[in-house]
Each structure stands twice: as C-alpha cells, then as structure tokens.
Amino acid sequence: MNTSSLADLAPGLADPVHDAQQVFRRLLDAMSRPGRLQSLDDAAVRVDPPAGLGAATAAVLLTIADPDLRVWFAPGAHAEALAAWLRFHTGARIAGSAIEADWLVLSAQDARPDVWSEAAIGTDEAPHTAATLLVEVLSLSAAPGLQLTGPGIEHHHSLDVGGVGTAFWQERQSREHHFPRGADLVLTCGPLIAALPRSTRIALED
C-alpha cells in the first residue's frame, strides 16, 4: 500500500483501548439480551467510518477484528476499500468467500435468504466455529415486526428491523432446528446495535 493510499484510509477508534472496551461490553450485552437495543454512545459517534459503513458497524469491526479473524465484505463498490481499511487498523484477514469467514459484513440490501446457506454454521461438537452476520439496516426500533423468544428474553420481545425482506427472516426461521449449529446475527443502525444469537427464535408479527 503506497503513501497516498494510506492517507486516504479513514481513521480508527478515537481512543482505541477505552472505546473498544466500551463497544465490547455493549456487544456482550446485546448478545445476552437478544433484540434489546444497545447504544454505542461516544465510541460509535467518535468513529469516522469509511464510505460504505455506518458508525456502529465500523466500531464493532474495529473492536472484534484481529489477525486471527477472517472477515468477508459483501461485493460492492466499497468492498475493496473497506477490506484495506480493516486490514490496516486491525490486521484482520479478508476471506475470499462467505463460507470461509468468521464474520460477514452486509448491508440491508445484501441480506438475502441465500446468505444463511453461505455462512458457516459450525458443528454439533464445535458450534462456536459458526459465523456471525453483521448487517447494517435502515432502522431499528422496539416495535412490532419480529417477535423474539428464547434464552435471555423474558416471555417475548418485539424488534422492528427496517430494510430487510421477509424472506430473509423466513429462511432464518427454517434453520432454527439446526441449533446448536447456526449463524449469529448482529444488526446495526447509526450508533445502535441489536443481536439475535442462534438460540433466539423468531416469529413474524403482523
């Protein structure tokens, strides 16, 4: 990478240690309380994300990525630049295909039903080797849309996800019987994140 290319890269976290700790705690909270909105507060706001990524998506990637992590960006106009940005700041490896990746980074438009079959789902003996889908959506709110049940949810919880088609969720539903195999899902919008671990069951609300 030449000097001019380096100058074009967007910066990382403003305070790498403090901000990464904050983002990681919020991410753990999101995974342990499925569907509950978590705000990344200053950590996301202080990220100047590259073109093609929102603040929360960038903050999560800068927090979880390291040289052992394989990340796949959905093909698009910004994919190559995003890969260079993430490699520069974290040393993460860029996967050549979705099935090779530990984390798949998608826009709402990229969240098609076939993504579920392209992501690694782990094995019964090693479910932790499954992938995580990181999807940047158009809106997130605690409103009717998806009804969530399962571990970490008392009774049920509603989450409305903007920009993701019904077929994506129907395919996710059809794979729930594979548990403990299955991909986890992290949703972002602006500074907000919400998570749907593979243990969470979903139903479409009217």
Task: Go through the PLM ranges and name each one.
Residues 1-30:
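N-terminal basic/disordered segments at the start of proteins
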Residues 1-9, 49, 60, 64, ...:
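A generic structural signal for ordered alpha-helices
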Residues 10-14, 70-72, 154-161:
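Flexible, glycine/proline-enriched loop segments at strand-loop-helix junctions
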Residues 27, 31, 64, 170-176:
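Generic hydrophobic, helix-prone segments enriched in Leu/Val/Ile
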Residues 30-96:
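A glycine-rich, hydrophobic loop/mini-helix early in the fold
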Residues 76, 80-195, 205-206:
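Internal, well-folded beta-alpha domain core
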Residues 198-202:
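Conserved, well-ordered active-site substructure
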